[in-house]
């Protein structure tokens, strides 16, 4: 019997966006380089290599997020223990909404995500570094 998916990704993202702050791209660009903010790039490493990256953003692959946030886990990254605002982004703003929701539910705060993701960032003229491939 085929699987019956009861909740699609669009509904999940919509629900996440009701729980978290969504920052417009122009506002997010102003946060770059601030001492009180960490921009968290959750894209896959291949996306960074292909499309480039935001200078100074911390790269945390989406698949490792929960493990890197948990201070009791062996994969914990100290950046997630800092008293800062964590602003997540992906390529288009869908995965980052889910990531910010998960981070918030784990107790990380404050968190937000960038509307439009890296694509919106580039379109708005935000600073970028080229990919390596």
What are these regions (language model features)?
Residues 1-37, 45-86, 94-133:
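Rhodanese-like catalytic fold shared by cysteine-dependent sulfurtransferases
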